[in-house]
């Protein structure tokens, strides 16, 4: 497992963003783990997370020249990532959307750098159903930008339904024709659990969950 994946999972565990136990998801599935990016709730934690994002993006080799953060969790993530890249000598323009359009001040739903003519990388925490990402794709295209990729912290690698054996990330990637990059995924989490004595008891529930809900790419 590459360093940024291990580093991210260690950070998530330390921040209590990654928890093990029994959690009921919005889908109704009972999951042995839960990820909440909102627990990266300080400057240091967010800066460390952004470095993991940057390493994953660089390793994937995606071509982009602007960062876009969908409201709401994508906004601080994209901002932190822009700061991480500035520290690496790359000053990237940044934009995000608001949920409700303003009819005063600067107006509209978009804030930040103009999207027109840019290759846009969408930054978010996870892809659950893909609704927010699909909305972001529409916003970017309507503003004249070209979506070039999507990056998220964790890919659960689980099927959308018994009828659709793809994950939400796979479905979005296929529909949009762009890569979805994850800092880490369920396969990485299984490897991480196997290598950590404190987590070894959670490996069997994780394997059982993958066996029931995992996509074909998690084997």
From Swiss-Prot:
Biochemical pathway: Pyrimidine metabolism; UMP biosynthesis via de novo pathway; UMP from orotate: step 1/2
UniProt cofactor(s): Mg(2+)
InterPro entries linked to this entry: OPRT, Or_phspho_trans_dom, PRibTrfase_dom, PRTase-like
Keyword Secreted: no
Keyword Glycosyltransferase set for record: yes
GO function terms (MF aspect): magnesium ion binding; orotate phosphoribosyltransferase activity
Residues annotated for 5-phospho-alpha-D-ribose 1-diphosphate binding in this entry: 26, 72-73, 98-99, 102, 104, 124-132
Any one annotated GO CC term: cytoplasm
GO biological process: 'de novo' pyrimidine nucleobase biosynthetic process; 'de novo' UMP biosynthetic process; pyrimidine ribonucleoside biosynthetic process
Enzyme Commission numbers on file: 2.4.2.10
Assigned keywords, A-Z: Glycosyltransferase, Magnesium, Pyrimidine biosynthesis, Transferase
Residue numbers binding orotate: 34-35, 128, 156
Pfam families (alphabetical): Pribosyltran (PF00156)
Catalyzed reactions: orotidine 5'-phosphate + diphosphate = orotate + 5-phospho-alpha-D-ribose 1-diphosphate
PANTHER family: OROTATE PHOSPHORIBOSYLTRANSFERASE 1-RELATED
Record's subunit section: Homodimer.
Family membership noted in the UniProt record: Belongs to the purine/pyrimidine phosphoribosyltransferase family. PyrE subfamily.
Function: Catalyzes the transfer of a ribosyl phosphate group from 5-phosphoribose 1-diphosphate to orotate, leading to the formation of orotidine monophosphate (OMP).
Name by which UniProt lists this protein: Orotate phosphoribosyltransferase
Originating organism: Xanthomonas oryzae pv. oryzae (strain MAFF 311018)
Phylogenetic lineage: Bacteria, Pseudomonadati, Pseudomonadota, Gammaproteobacteria, Lysobacterales
């Amino acid at each position: 497992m590459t360093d940024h994946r291990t580093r991210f999972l260690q950070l998530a565990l330390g921040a209590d963003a990654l928890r093990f136990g029994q959690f009921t998801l919005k889908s109704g599935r009972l999951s042995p783990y839960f990820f909440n990016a909102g627990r990266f709730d300080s400057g240091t934690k967010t800066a460390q997370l952004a470095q993991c994002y940057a390493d994953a993006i660089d390793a994937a080799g995606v071509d982009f020249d602007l960062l876009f953060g969908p409201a709401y969790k994508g906004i601080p993530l994209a901002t932190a990532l822009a700061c991480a890249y500035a520290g690496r000598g790359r000053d990237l323009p940044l934009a995000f959307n608001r949920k409700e359009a303003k009819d005063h001040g600067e107006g509209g739903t978009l804030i930040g750098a103009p999207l027109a003519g840019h290759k846009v990388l969408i930054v978010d925490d996870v892809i659950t159903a893909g609704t927010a990402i699909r909305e972001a794709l529409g916003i970017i295209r309507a503003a004249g930008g070209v979506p070039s990729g999507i990056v998220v912290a964790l890919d659960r690698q689980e099927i959308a339904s018994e009828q659709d054996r793809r994950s939400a990330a796979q479905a979005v990637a296929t529909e949009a024709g762009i890569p979805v990059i994850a800092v880490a995924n369920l396969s990485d989490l299984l490897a991480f659990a196997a290598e950590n004595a404190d987590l070894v008891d959670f490996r069997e529930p994780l394997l059982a969950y993958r066996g029931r809900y995992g996509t074909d790419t998690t084997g």
